[in-house]
């Protein structure tokens, strides 16, 4: 059975009475090269255990099972369990975990299932859960790399550089923890049903240490980042005033920004990780005098 052949897919789904769920963002691959190239991009080999989220009917799962020592897939849709039981019947290194990835303890899952192996993530993520899932995976601090197919617009935002329209708070979060790289596009016609947008494969190599080490700590660092991007059209001074103005005052904030070497009228999107680290540290020092 070819899990990327439309006739085989329809016959398989028909046998199990499966119907696509719009609420779950289900789009199944119908081009063989896509799951093959995604699995290859993940870098999985016999030293790795792979966590897959939303395996669907299993085309990427099969490719991963051929490469990795172990593949553990989390699937929410109960209607797909009997489908996967059929398509993955011959894969001894495959484990299905029924459930919602956002409700699972990811570090505990990895520690239980991946002992002695290097954990990776490789998945075709539903568009509607991309940001919270990536956040949870990064914060789990368990994975060597995270390779996902997501909406191209989101992939570009994650990998965006300072001063570009795509750059924002989530760019900084992902780049603080990982080294993201957009690898290749996947057009809508590669899916059944076809989505309205182009997808892209993004690989994020997880940093052993964060890209910068703000003395103020991660929590305050990202509080500063979120404040700077809360209203993109505002200057950095006005954005920070909305959050810190009650404690520091606008004149003090302007002096802090200038001490960091920036014009108070600059927008937050112009600052990189190191600039935000310097700014957050100065704000923190002033607040804790």
Predicted region positions:
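Catalytic cores of RNA-modifying enzymes
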Residues: 1-227, 258, 267-269, 278, ...
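C-terminal lobe and adjacent flexible extensions of AdoMet/dcAdoMet transferase-like proteins
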Residues: 227-289
């Amino acid at each position: 059975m070819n899990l990327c052949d439309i006739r085989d897919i329809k016959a398989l789904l028909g046998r199990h009475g499966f119907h696509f769920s719009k609420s779950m963002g289900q789009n199944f691959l119908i081009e063989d090269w896509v799951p093959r190239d995604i699995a290859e991009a993940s870098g999985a080999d016999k030293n790795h255990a792979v966590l897959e989220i939303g395996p669907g009917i299993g085309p990427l799962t099969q490719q991963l099972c051929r490469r990795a020592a172990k593949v553990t897939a989390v699937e929410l849709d109960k209607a797909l369990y009997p489908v996967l039981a059929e398509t993955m019947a011959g894969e001894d290194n495959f484990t299905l975990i029924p459930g919602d990835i956002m409700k699972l303890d990811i570090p505990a899952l990895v520690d239980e299932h991946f002992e002695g192996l290097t954990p990776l993530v490789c998945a075709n993520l539903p568009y509607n859960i991309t940001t919270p899932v990536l956040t949870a995976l990064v914060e789990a601090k368990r994975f060597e790399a995270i390779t996902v197919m997501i909406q191209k617009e989101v992939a570009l935002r994650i990998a965006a550089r300072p001063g570009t329209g795509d750059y924002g708070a989530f760019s900084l979060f992902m780049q603080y923890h990982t080294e993201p790289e957009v690898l290749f596009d996947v057009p809508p016609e590669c899916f059944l049903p076809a989505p309205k947008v182009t997808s892209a494969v993004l690989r994020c190599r997880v940093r052993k240490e964060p890209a910068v080490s703000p003395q103020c700590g991660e929590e305050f660092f990202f509080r500063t980042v979120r404040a700077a991007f809360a209203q993109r059209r505002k200057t950095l001074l006005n954005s920070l005033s909305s959050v810190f103005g009650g404690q520091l005052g606008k004149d003090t904030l302007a002096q802090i920004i200038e001490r960091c070497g920036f014009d108070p009228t600059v927008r937050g999107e112009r600052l990189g990780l190191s600039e935000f680290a310097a700014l957050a540290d100065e704000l923190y020092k002033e607040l804790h005098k």
